[in-house]
Amino acid sequence: MRCPNCNSLDTQVKDSRPTEDSSVIRRRRVCVACNFRFTTFERVQLRELTVIKRNGRRVPFDRDKLMRSVQISLRKRQVEPERVEKMVSTIVRELETGGEAEISSEVIGETVMEHLRTLDDVAYVRFASVYRNFREAKDFADVLGELSGEEEARLAAIRK
């Protein structure tokens, strides 16, 4: 591992431990050349995914881009970062174990929406508005109607 301070390749791992959900390994490192201490994170990657964009282009899957888009939809919402990280890890794991090395951006978007729907309704609507390219207020009303209908069905099931 290259030292971010002096660019030396001579570093040592001082401490290694998994995160709470064991999806990431946190390593505390020290540079032998300058004694700079830094932390790295390692994540298991089951397979290389390629995203097929709507215009047909193929690009490598970027977990960080997925995380950024989810975080944008959750901006100013009271959702713990650990829950967001766990949700994104779950989504990535589902995509990696789905059997296909190439996956359409539509499948990724629908998977994210499915998970956001259970995490935070407002984030779900925000993400849907960008992903589904809402053009008018009716588009928002339709999604809100879906959410209201699901809530009414859930309450009716509880009452029975």
Swiss-Prot record:
<dbReference type="GO" id="GO:0005524">
    <property type="term" value="F:ATP binding"/>
</dbReference>
<feature type="compositionally biased region" description="Polar residues">
    <location>
        <begin position="1"/>
        <end position="11"/>
    </location>
</feature>
<dbReference type="InterPro" id="IPR055173">
    <property type="entry name" value="NrdR-like_N"/>
</dbReference>
<keyword id="KW-0479">Metal-binding</keyword>
<feature type="zinc finger region">
    <location>
        <begin position="3"/>
        <end position="34"/>
    </location>
</feature>
<feature type="domain" description="ATP-cone">
    <location>
        <begin position="49"/>
        <end position="139"/>
    </location>
</feature>
<dbReference type="Pfam" id="PF03477">
    <property type="entry name" value="ATP-cone"/>
</dbReference>
<keyword id="KW-0067">ATP-binding</keyword>
<dbReference type="InterPro" id="IPR003796">
    <property type="entry name" value="RNR_NrdR-like"/>
</dbReference>
<protein>
    <recommendedName>
        <fullName>Transcriptional repressor NrdR</fullName>
    </recommendedName>
</protein>
<dbReference type="GO" id="GO:0008270">
    <property type="term" value="F:zinc ion binding"/>
</dbReference>
<feature type="region of interest" description="Disordered">
    <location>
        <begin position="1"/>
        <end position="20"/>
    </location>
</feature>
<keyword id="KW-0863">Zinc-finger</keyword>
<dbReference type="InterPro" id="IPR005144">
    <property type="entry name" value="ATP-cone_dom"/>
</dbReference>
<dbReference type="GO" id="GO:0045892">
    <property type="term" value="P:negative regulation of DNA-templated transcription"/>
</dbReference>
<keyword id="KW-0804">Transcription</keyword>
<keyword id="KW-0678">Repressor</keyword>
<dbReference type="GO" id="GO:0003690">
    <property type="term" value="F:double-stranded DNA binding"/>
</dbReference>
<keyword id="KW-0238">DNA-binding</keyword>
<keyword id="KW-0862">Zinc</keyword>
<keyword id="KW-0547">Nucleotide-binding</keyword>
<comment type="function">
    <text>Negatively regulates transcription of bacterial ribonucleotide reductase nrd genes and operons by binding to NrdR-boxes.</text>
</comment>
<comment type="similarity">
    <text>Belongs to the NrdR family.</text>
</comment>
<dbReference type="Pfam" id="PF22811">
    <property type="entry name" value="Zn_ribbon_NrdR"/>
</dbReference>
<keyword id="KW-0805">Transcription regulation</keyword>
